[in-house]
Amino acid sequence: MRNSQDTMTIQSTPVGGQDPAQGSGESARDRLLDAGTRLFCRYGINATGVDAIVSEAGTAKTTLYKIFGSKEGLVEAVLEGEGRRWRDWFISSIDEGGPGPRPKLDRIFPVIKTWFADERFYGCPFINAVGEHDKNDDRMRTIAIGHKKIVLRHIEKLADQAGAADPAGLAHQIGLLIDGAIIAAMVTRDCAVADAAEIAARTLLDNHTRPVRKKAKPLMTA
């Protein structure tokens, strides 16, 4: 997902002390969300402690617990906000591809490539969160699936408008290409993996939207 904002100046707050930024323009909730987003995306959830979060946000620990209840509560709020921002960006960006559905579908991986090229790209927070949590804990998986369903629903709608024989199946296949490209780009730091995914996606689109030829009727014989 796209990271929220450029890194802000880290402020030091005494543990358990009063929030020094109370009354400032940006709420403590927003500062904690911004700090959580930056730190979780770059360093990982498990590697980021509460002390680092409140130091980055310039708040007290008690403020974090009062607003979010726990670090896990902050993690879930960060994922919700990041998912919403990323989906808004992704959908609006591919919809700029042209008036018809096919140009929009063709823009999926060029758009994804611009995300990969961003120096703040650290992979997908949802994939990362599921990977870091207990595999028997369904909370992160449920949040990740909810995000994925919204993305695939939009792709499926475009696929249906493009005349795909199986819009849901096509959307699922493109979704797998997106996930694979994200992981490959995160590991290799090579945004060109999006180009290979684009070639595969165009092949899928061509196959799914190719008109079905009707069999010619046999010629009448005398």
Model-derived features with residue positions:
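Amphipathic alpha-helical segments used for helix-helix packing
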Residues: 104, 118-138
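Helix-turn-helix
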Residues: 31, 35-73, 77
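N-terminal intrinsically disordered/low-complexity leader segments
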Residues: 1-27, 209-222
